[in-house]
From Swiss-Prot:
Its cofactor is Mg(2+). Residues 32-42 have a biased composition (Acidic residues). This is Wee1-like protein kinase. The keyword Cell inner membrane does not apply. Mg(2+) 1 binds at residues 430, 462. One of its GO terms (biological process) is cell division. It comes from Mus musculus (Mouse). The lineage of its organism: Eukaryota, Metazoa, Chordata, Craniata, Vertebrata. Pfam families: Pkinase. The modification Phosphothreonine is found at residues 187, 190, 239. It is found in: Nucleus. Acts as a negative regulator of entry into mitosis (G2 to M transition) by protecting the nucleus from cytoplasmically activated cyclin B1-complexed CDK1 before the onset of mitosis by mediating phosphorylation of CDK1 on 'Tyr-15'. Specifically phosphorylates and inactivates cyclin B1-complexed CDK1 reaching a maximum during G2 phase and a minimum as cells enter M phase. Phosphorylation of cyclin B1-CDK1 occurs exclusively on 'Tyr-15' and phosphorylation of monomeric CDK1 does not occur. Its activity increases during S and G2 phases and decreases at M phase when it is hyperphosphorylated.
């Protein structure tokens, strides 16, 4: 081949002509150098690609070919053999990808010429895919060393040693587009999983310094924003299913409709997924950076009470003008033991909601390491204040008022126990009095509460010791009202401990001496012996109180049984069901009386009719007799005779 034919850029041909080109190839013996000499003699330095391709013989290096390549060559040389499809031609190209057209991809200026495999000479036919050839060292045809790049496969000597060899030194990389056209892999490219992309990002890929700098800045800013936006919440242990509610938050996975190959989007999505699966953090009572809510929203009127937890203030809310009771802790709670009790009270208030015999809860917040709880204001104070005032003036609650107290607090305990909670600190200072003239509505259970005095309403408050019945975390309350089984850490009958404390609360309201905190009298009470009551109570009430402090908690009535006890449901305090039963009985009696009345009326009517008939008969008989007498008289009488006397 002439030097001019190598330097002149060959004309562009379509790759689709390779199939027809392959069928017209004519092989002639001779070396490459002889062919070039003939071309020089003819003066055909501008020969076309077809002439050079038709007249060039095979490369004289067929000895080191593999059996698969030899079989492919034999099929091409057999007479009448034609490739079945263009895909078969590309398969042959892949088998001999170490040389020929496969090697034409790696060169410099002459790398655009496509060598027809099996001939060893360069063809000026331009391949459209040569612009996309890759120079990657990885190839389906692997060679043993850097010198094994010959078209005959691995282990063959390099053809470039021959000065007349037309093969340049190209790496063994197949055409990129041609390899894709083989469709060896039918499935589409599978996107990387989230974990694999995260590993790729963590391993550190090669990136531009400027782009990575801005990317890190953006991602760090995004993470700081997400951290600020992620709320920290407490988990209420008194909700029906706190574990399920918490786990459902973990399952809020954000589904994407497509996968983005961008590393920024991928890392951002991974971080969002981690934020959603992050467990909720517990908020501690710390100083707030905002303005004091207590002084901003409320106007303090007076201090109405104090206790172990803190002080209670009577306040007016500036917005609505209503009066509330604000409970503020005495000392800072952050990190102290009382913090758990404060949070437990907030949890219990939030779960219990609104009930006529439970102090209503509105809100709670932390301010300057103090807990503040906004509750309903009870204008009658606590029962302990009323007992102290009665003890000072030597006045006690009457038996009717004691029954009223038992029934109302019992209904409050029934509601708390129905929520699978126990109060564990029932005592006079935790029962509040609300005096109102508004008639009470029908309770949730359907019981009519109109019989209750419309002047006094007893409510249960201070829920700092509330715990669950199923998984108790008991914090012992006042020892004066503590049941013995709780002291012995027997938590199998916790609702009955509230009944025990309620009985002693009623005893204190009845005028008994202050209860002992320990000692022999304390044990006597736990053995079922009532303290001395200065007033005389009925036998039924005394027996009910004695049963409520029975040493065996199973013998004590439950809150449900207590509110339906016959002692508390007197003639004026009967339930709607009992009133309905009595009404039905009275209706039955009335129906019987009506039947008797009808019978009496019928009998009287019959008697009157008989009497009238008898009277008529007597009148008819007397008339007949009178007529007969006149006729007789007429017969007996002589005819009148007129006399004329002169």
């Amino acid at each position: 081949m002439s030097f001019l034919s190598r330097q002149q850029p060959p004309p562009t041909r379509r790759v689709g002509a390779a199939y027809s080109l392959r069928q017209k190839l004519i092989f002639s013996p001779g070396s490459d150098c002889e062919e070039e000499e003939e071309e020089e003699e003819e003066g055909s330095g501008h020969s076309t690609g077809e002439d050079s391709a038709f007249q060039e013989p095979d490369s004289p290096l067929p000895s080191a070919r593999s059996p698969a390549e030899a079989e492919a060559e034999r099929r091409r040389r057999s007479p009448g053999a034609e490739p079945s499809s263009p895909g078969e031609l590309e398969d042959d190209l892949l088998l001999q990808g170490g040389g020929g057209g496969a090697q034409a991809a790696g060169g410099g200026a002459e790398g655009d010429s496509w060598e027809e495999e099996g001939f060893g000479s360069s063809s000026p036919v331009k391949s459209p895919s040569t612009a996309y050839f890759l120079s990657s060292p990885f190839s389906p045809v692997r060679c043993g060393g850097p010198g094994d790049a010959s078209p005959q496969g691995c282990g063959a000597p390099r053809a470039m040693d021959d000065p007349c060899s037309p093969q340049p030194d190209y790496p063994s990389t197949p055409p990129h587009k041609t390899f894709r056209k083989l469709r060896l892999f039918d499935t589409p490219h599978t996107p990387k999983s989230l974990l694999s992309k995260a590993r790729v990002i963590d391993s550190g890929s090669v990136k531009l310094r400027g782009s990575s700098l801005f990317m890190d800045t953006e991602k760090s800013g995004k993470r700081e924003f997400d951290t600020r936006q992620t709320p920290q919440v407490n988990i209420n242990p008194f909700t029906p299913d706190p574990v399920l509610l918490h786990s459902s938050g973990r399952c809020r996975g954000r589904k994407r409709a497509y996968f983005n190959d961008s590393s920024e989007d991928m890392e951002a999505s991974d971080y969002e997924f981690e934020d959603e699966t992050r467990p909720a953090k517990r908020i501690t009572i710390t100083e707030s950076n905002m303005k004091s809510r207590y002084t901003t929203e409320f106007h303090e009127l007076e201090k109405i009470g104090s206790g172990e937890f803190g002080s209670v203030f009577k306040c007016v809310k500036r917005l609505d003008g209503c009066i509330y009771a604000i409970k503020r802790s005495k000392k800072p709670l952050a990190g102290s033991v009382d913090e758990q009790n404060a949070l437990r009270e907030v949890y219990a208030h939030a779960v219990l909601g609104q009930h006529p015999h439970v102090v209503r809860y509105f809100s709670a917040w932390a301010e300057d390491d103090h807990m503040l709880i906004q509750n309903e204001y009870c204008n009658g104070g606590s029962l302990a204040d009323a007992i102290s005032e009665n003890y000072r003036v030597m006045s006690y609650l009457t038996e009717v008022e004691l029954k009223d107290l038992l029934l109302q607090v019992g209904r409050g305990l029934r509601y708390i126990h129905s929520m699978s909670l126990v109060h564990m600190d029932i005592k006079p200072s935790n029962i509040f009095i609300s005096r109102t003239s508004i008639p009470n509505a029908v309770s949730e259970e359907g019981d009519e509460d109109d019989w209750i005095s419309n002047k006094v309403m007893f409510k249960i408050g201070d829920l700092g010791h509330v715990t669950r019945i199923s998984s108790p975390q008991v914090e012992e309350g006042d020892s004066r009202f503590l049941a013995n089984e709780v002291l012995q850490e027997n938590y199998s009958h916790l609702p009955k401990a509230d009944i025990f404390a309620l009985a002693l609360t009623v005893v204190c309201a009845a005028g008994a001496e202050p209860l002992p905190r320990n000692g022999e009298q304390w044990h006597e009470i736990r053995q079922g012996r009532l303290p001395r009551i200065p007033q005389v109570l009925s036998q039924e009430v005394t027996e009910l109180l004695r049963v409520m402090i029975h040493p065996d908690p199973e013998r004590r009535p439950s809150a449900m049984e207590l509110v339906k006890h016959s002692v508390l449901l007197s003639a004026s305090r009967k339930s709607a069901e009992q009133l309905r039963i009595e009404l039905n009985a009275e209706k039955f009696k009335n129906s019987l009386l009506q039947k008797e009345l009808k019978k009496a009326q019928m009998a009287a009517k019959v008697a009157a009719e008989e009497r009238a008939l008898f009277t008529d008969r007597m009148a008819t008989r007397s008339t007949t007799q009178s007529n007969r007498t006149s006729r007789l008289i007429g017969k007996k009488m002589n005819r009148s005779v007129s006399l004329t006397i002169y």
